[in-house]
Regions:
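Hydrophobic/aromatic residues within well-ordered alpha-helical segments
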Residues: 1, 55, 80, 113-117, ...
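Basic, helix-initiating cap at the start of DNA-binding domains
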Residues: 1-16, 20-32, 54
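HTH DNA-binding helix-turn interface
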Residues: 15-18, 32, 38-50
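Hydrophobic alpha-helical connector segments
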Residues: 57-96, 102
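Secondary-structure edge/capping motif, primarily at the C-terminal ends of alpha-helices
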Residues: 87, 128, 152-160
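Hydrophobic alpha-helical bundle segments that form small-molecule/ligand-binding pockets
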Residues: 89, 103, 115-141
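Hydrophobic alpha-helical segments that form the core
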Residues: 100, 135-155, 167-176
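C-terminal peripheral helix-coil segments that are non-catalytic and often amphipathic
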Residues: 123, 161-180
């Protein structure tokens, strides 16, 4: 039901605008009460971001599972390249991404959720055996990786989804790769 409710909400947001769509509108369109809506999502914004924490945990687990001795930047590149399509396919198609980019409240929520995701990934990077990464370095690498994903996503949106997102991610990671 969460997935169906999220899809319905997105359709209403696109049709009416985010600000002009209420929780009552979403609930009514789904045949639910407002109270029932809140059993599935704590807020209107969370309809678009409901699975981010679970996804963040899975990405962090993938970081921990990478081969010992692999350079931290290579770990982030490999994991985020692999997960990039799943991260966006989870709930964010082009309509959702455009809605988020054009709605200040949703952009703020996205940044809040991304902060949590970056924290989980940074922690996972530090916890890898033999890395010896300090918090500052892990946070910096993770923030740069997030910037690479953001830039790749924006470029993909600028070209109406016709570019290969994986290639954009590779390009961004190559451009931001730490020097020797």
């Amino acid at each position: 039901m969460r997935t169906e409710l999220a899809e319905l909400a997105l359709a209403l947001f696109v049709e009416r605008g985010y600000e002009d769509t209420t929780v009552e509108d979403i609930a009514a369109a789904a045949g639910l009460s407002k109270r029932s809506f809140f059993r599935y999502f704590p807020s209107k914004e969370d309809v678009l971001f409901g699975d981010v924490e679970d996804l963040a945990d899975r990405v962090a687990d993938a970081v921990r599972a990478r081969p010992a001795g692999e350079e931290p930047w290579a770990v982030l590149h490999a994991v985020l390249r692999e997960w990039e399509a799943r991260i966006h396919a989870a709930q964010w198609d082009m309509a959702a991404l455009r809605l988020i980019e054009s709605t200040p409240a949703l952009r703020a929520r996205l940044h809040q959720r991304r902060d949590g995701m970056r924290d989980r990934i940074s922690t996972a990077l530090r916890e890898r055996p033999g890395t010896g990464l300090d918090t500052f370095t892990a946070d910096l690498l993770t923030a740069c990786a997030a910037a690479a994903i953001d830039a790749a996503t924006r470029e993909w949106l600028r070209h109406d989804g016709t570019d290969d997102r994986g290639e954009l991610v590779d390009r961004a990671f190559t451009m931001l790769a730490p020097g020797p």
